[in-house]
Amino acid sequence: MRQRVACCWVLLLLAATFCQPAAAKGGRGGSRGAARGMARGAARSRHRGLPRYGGALRVAAAAAAAGAAAGAALHQARAETEYHEGNGTAWTSVAPGWVEWGWAMPWLCPLAAILHH
């Protein structure tokens, strides 16, 4: 289950990276001049809204969240399969959960691969 959560975070990161809207308003585009009310007698004061964060910052935030989620899921998967004193099982009786998809880990989430080592 935790592996699926990590994969979902990775897919979310990839979607945020590659699906940035190319037609998004940038720079000085959009409605200006008369369409904003200058010709209708509006005051000449410029009202600035809150600063908007760019796509690069959103992608970086998504990358940090995906790396943290994947690292936590990997750590939890390891903790569940390792030998503990009180559970009465030998370390050879349980196969680690990350072996079955360990080949995909380095290219799906490089940060999780770094945390893996």
From Swiss-Prot:
What does UniProt give as the signal peptide span? 1-24
GPI-anchor amidated alanine lipid sites: 104
- Name the Gene Ontology molecular function terms of this record: nucleic acid binding
The task this protein performs is described as: Prion-like protein that has PrP(C)-like neuroprotective activity.
Q: Could you tell me where this protein is found in the cell?
A: Cell membrane
Annotated Gene Ontology cellular component terms:
nucleus; plasma membrane; side of membrane
Query: Per the UniProt entry, what are the Gene Ontology biological process annotations, in alphabetical order?
Result: protein import into nucleus
Give membrane topology per the record: Lipid-anchor; GPI-anchor
Q: What is this protein called?
A: Shadow of prion protein
Which positions are listed as propeptide? 105-117
Q: Which UniProt keywords apply?
A: Amyloid, Cell membrane, Glycoprotein, GPI-anchor, Lipoprotein, Membrane, Prion, Signal
- Which gene specifies this protein's sequence? SPRN
Where is this chain glycosylated? 87
| Homology family | Belongs to the SPRN family.
Q: Which Pfam families match?
A: Shadoo
